[in-house]
Amino acid sequence: MDSIHGHYHIQLSNYSAGENLQSATPPEGVIGAHRVKVETALSHSNRQKKLSATIKHNQSSRSMLDRKLTSDGKVNQRSSFTFSMIMYRMIHFVLSTRVPAVRESVANYGGNINFKFAQTKGAFLHQIIKHSDTARGACEALCAHWIRSHAQGQSLFDQLYVGGRKGKFQIDTLYSIKQLQIDGCKADVDQDEVTLDWLKKNGISERMIERHCLLPTVDVTGTTGSEGPDQLLNAILDTNGIGYGYKKISLSGQMSGHTIAAYVNENSGVTFFDPNFGEFHFSDKEKFSKWFTNSFWENSMYHYPLGVGQSFSVFTFDSKEV
């Protein structure tokens, strides 16, 4: 969210010669017929510093994109300011305090951090907070793009950042992520259906298993809450006898929702992506299971029913195996 700074300064003029400014009562507005003018070297210096900081901030905001327009001539999405943006920023801050604990726990359970990413802070938050439909987060769209990139044998972060390193965004990918999230937040649509349609257009379809001459999807829904994450974990790791699969995992609670993703392979292990914490890899399902159950579920604060720890839906997708 772009900050709006209001600068106020009081000026005192038309003082007679020899008048002691230091002994005068600090004025507000106009005293008698005298215009107000209080000017000190210190206040002037402070204003210069603030102006310089503002200019640098605006310049850095613009330079965060590799170019001003997308390949098809579209500008980075933004909307009018709403007070909900302030609330979402505070929620992001609370979640961002959990980042160190989650990341530090990965190595303790034999995992590796592939990429440190967090939509709850830093430059990416600055981008999504610009629009009311992405200010609360872009987890659904991020996970869809992550699945597509991984299925293509690529990295989402190579596509999102210039050179694959944090610093400058590639506007085409940033725009695509934000737009998918915006499309899924429209009042007359189902976000899951919007995401499923987008994935299908990108060559990734829901897995279907033939049963009694029918081809139903293998989506799994369940509850967490006081039951813990065991049922959720089983749904994530189940590859339906095929040996691998992509997972889009929707978590819901009393007041919020969140989406995470995973690629599960019986031979190479589990690659896990949470837009709040980053991309992690565990060489086998057992290591991932212990980490998810004994550490991640609580460290992330996802176990709270008031947050997202009440129910779940797990969607499984097929694509070319990578």
UniProtKB/Swiss-Prot annotation:
Coiled-coil stretches noted in the UniProt entry, renumbered to this chain: none
Range of residues in the leader sequence: none
Gene Ontology molecular-function annotations: cysteine-type endopeptidase activity
Chief subcellular location: secreted
Localization in the cell: Secreted
Organism: Yersinia enterocolitica serotype O:8 / biotype 1B (strain NCTC 13174 / 8081)
EC number: 3.4.22.-
Membership in a protein family: Belongs to the peptidase C58 family.
Region feature (Disordered): 42-69
Subunit structure: Interacts with human ARHA.
Keywords from the named record: Hydrolase, Plasmid, Protease, Secreted, Thiol protease, Virulence
Superkingdom of the organism of origin: Bacteria
Gene of this entry: yopT1
GO terms (BP aspect): proteolysis
Keyword field contains Protein transport: no
Name of the featured protein: Cysteine protease yopT1
InterPro entries, sorted: Papain-like_cys_pep_sf (IPR038765), Peptidase_C58 (IPR003951), Peptidase_C58_Yopt (IPR006473)
One Gene Ontology cellular component: extracellular region
